[in-house]
Curated annotation (Swiss-Prot):
Domain of life: Bacteria
Lineage of producing organism: Bacteria, Bacillati, Bacillota, Clostridia, Peptostreptococcales
Region listing for Disordered, in residue ranges: 1-20
Cofactor notes: Binds 2 magnesium ions per tetramer.
Cofactors demanded by this protein: Mg(2+)
Protein name: Phenylalanine--tRNA ligase alpha subunit
Species per Swiss-Prot/TrEMBL record: Alkaliphilus metalliredigens (strain QYMF)
UniProt cross-references to Pfam families, sorted A to Z: Phe_tRNA-synt_N (PF02912), tRNA-synt_2d (PF01409)
Protein family according to the UniProt entry: Belongs to the class-II aminoacyl-tRNA synthetase family. Phe-tRNA synthetase alpha subunit type 1 subfamily.
C-alpha cells in the first residue's frame, strides 16, 4: 500500500509538470484528489488493512495528498504568470503613441445667459425665488387675474394633467406664492422652465426657459419699472442699446407694456434679423394689477408693484445671433463650443 501511494504521488507530479494551463491543472486535481480520484480510491482500500497498518498508511496518504496539493499550487502560480506574460505580449502598448483625448464639455449658452441675468438682478437687490413646474390652475391662471375664457387656458396652449393640475406656462406662479408667504417689500426674480403646447419650429419649443421679476412696496411707480429695465438691458446688451416701451395688454398688469430694443445685428438700421424694423421685441412688463395684489392678500391701496417677464431662450438667441431655437436643445458640441 505504501509503495502504491508513492507511485501515485510520482505519477501525479508528472501530470502536473506536463500541464500548461489552469484548465489542465484542474483536470489533474480532479483525477487524483476528486471524490472519484485515484488517491480517494486507494484510501477506500484501507479497510482491508490490519489495525496496526492503518495509522501508518493513513499518515503516508495524508502526506501524499499534501505533496500533490502543494505541487498543484506551485504549478498554478507558474501557469498564471506565463498566461499573463503571454497576454501582455499580445496587448503590448507603445508608450510613444499619443493618448486618446476625451472631449471636454462647456457651459451651455443658455446657462451662461441665465447666470449673467441672475448676476445683474442680484446686483440690483433682487433675490432668486423658485417654485414647482407642475402647478395648479389657481396659481397659473386664477390668481393672476386670467379670465375663465382666456385663450391661454385652452388645451391647445397648455399641458393639462387633469382639470386642476397643469405644467406651468410661465414662472408667474412663483410671484403669487411669494406674495402669499412674504409681506412687502418684495424684490424677486424667478427663473425656470415653462411648458406650452407649441409645435417645434425655429422660434418655438414645447419647453422653454423664462425669467420673471416682481417688485412690491409702497410708492412703486411705472418710472421705477422703466429705470430697472433700462439698467438691466444696458448691462446685458451694452450701453449703446436703445429701449422702447409700447402699450400692450396683459391680464396680470395694468398698465402693461412690451419692451423693444435696438437690433443687436444692425444697431437699429434694419436687417433680416429684425425684419427691417431696427427693433426686436424683448419682454413684457407692467404695473401689478390690483386684483392680483388682492388675490395674494396685499392691499393695493397701500402697496403697488411692477412685474416683467422674458424668455431666456430668445434672449440668448438675440445676444448670440442664433437663428433657430432648436439648436439650443440638440446637445451638439460643435454648436456649444462656439460660445
Amino acid at each position: 500500500m505504501e509503495a502504491k501511494l508513492k507511485q501515485l504521488e510520482e505519477k501525479a507530479k508528472q501530470d502536473i509538470q506536463a500541464s500548461t494551463s489552469t484548465d489542465s491543472l484542474e483536470k489533474v486535481r480532479v483525477k487524483y484528489l476528486g471524490k472519484k480520484g485515484e488517491l480517494t480510491e486507494v484510501l477506500r482500500g484501507m479497510g482491508s488493512l490490519s489495525k496496526e497498518e492503518r495509522p501508518l498508511v493513513g499518515k503516508i496518504a495524508n502526506l501524499v495528498r499534501e505533496q500533490i496539493e502543494e505541487a498543484l499550487e506551485l504549478a498554478k502560480g507558474a501557469v498564471k504568470d506565463k498566461e499573463l506574460e503571454s497576454k501582455l505580449k499580445m496587448e503590448s502598448l507603445d508608450v510613444t503613441m499619443p493618448g486618446k483625448t476625451r472631449e471636454i464639455g462647456k457651459r451651455h449658452p443658455l446657462i451662461q445667459a441665465m447666470d449673467e441675468l441672475k448676476s445683474i438682478f442680484i446686483g440690483m437687490g433682487f433675490k432668486v425665488a423658485e417654485g414647482p413646474e407642475v402647478e395648479t390652475v389657481h396659481y397659473n391662471f386664477d390668481a393672476l387675474n386670467a379670465a375663465p375664457n382666456h385663450p391661454s387656458r385652452d388645451m391647445s396652449d397648455t399641458f393639462y394633467i387633469n382639470d386642476h393640475i397643469i405644467l406651468r406656462t410661465q414662472t408667474s406662479p412663483v410671484q403669487v406664492r411669494t406674495m402669499e408667504l412674504q409681506k412687502p417689500p418684495i424684490r424677486i426674480i424667478s427663473p425656470g422652465r415653462c411648458f406650452r403646447n407649441d409645435t417645434p419650429d425655429a422660434t418655438h419649443t414645447p419647453m422653454f426657459h423664462q425669467l420673471e421679476g416682481l417688485v412690491v412696496d409702497k410708492g412703486i411707480t411705472l418710472g421705477d419699472l422703466k429705470g430697472t429695465l433700462e439698467v438691466f438691458i444696458k448691462q446685458f446688451f451694452g450701453n449703446d442699446t436703445k429701449v422702447k416701451f409700447r402699450p400692450h395688454h396683459f391680464p396680470f398688469t395694468e398698465p402693461s407694456a412690451e419692451v423693444d430694443v435696438t437690433c443687436f445685428k444692425c444697431a437699429g438700421h434694419g436687417c433680416s434679423m429684425c425684419k427691417g424694423e431696427g427693433w426686436i421685441e424683448l419682454l413684457g412688463a407692467g404695473m401689478v394689477h390690483p386684483n392680483v395684489l388682492r388675490n395674494c392678500g396685499i392691499d393695493p391701496e397701500i402697496y403697488s408693484g411692477f412685474a416683467f417677464g422674458m424668455g431666456i431662450d430668445r434672449l440668448t438667441m438675440a445676444k448670440y445671433e442664433i437663428d433657430d431655437i432648436r439648436l439650443l436643445f440638440e446637445n451638439d458640441m460643435r454648436f456649444i463650443n462656439q460660445f
